[in-house]
Amino acid sequence: MAVLIPAALVTFFIGIAGIIFMPDEIKNKPLDFDRGTIKIDHSVIDVEIAESDAERQRWLMFRNEEFSLNSAMILVYPKSDLYALWLLNIQYNLDIMWFNEEGKLVYYIKDAKPCENPLDPHNCTYKTTVPAKYIVVSTEGFLKGNNITNSSILTPISI
């Protein structure tokens, strides 16, 4: 057991260093996410869809351009669970919404701040307290701009 803890720490720090010092050609490589449309209450939202494990892991990392208030990214999971988002290498603040399988908003965070220190993930990891199947993320101000409330409903149109 005493050997496993230092080995795990070394592995963790090597992984962090790899992400931080990733070459620009990998960082800046655009991902071609599928596009679709959702509706939240009465607002029709254009979305980029992150559905595979690789897409959900890379999602908005190293992306400089922010979303407009009528666009977002939706992370789609195979089943409901307590999914967390680590805002490592995210360039701007986000509004984050978790929706259950029925499309009901179960949790949200306004103005989530990205990591300032990648060695302290506790200050930039956001997790729902209720199982969710979908996470919708957009630029800060999305919640207010689209009048999202605790009773908001997500309706997938084409995802």
Tell what function each PLM region has.
Residues G15-I159:
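Compact, glycine-rich, soluble single-domain proteins
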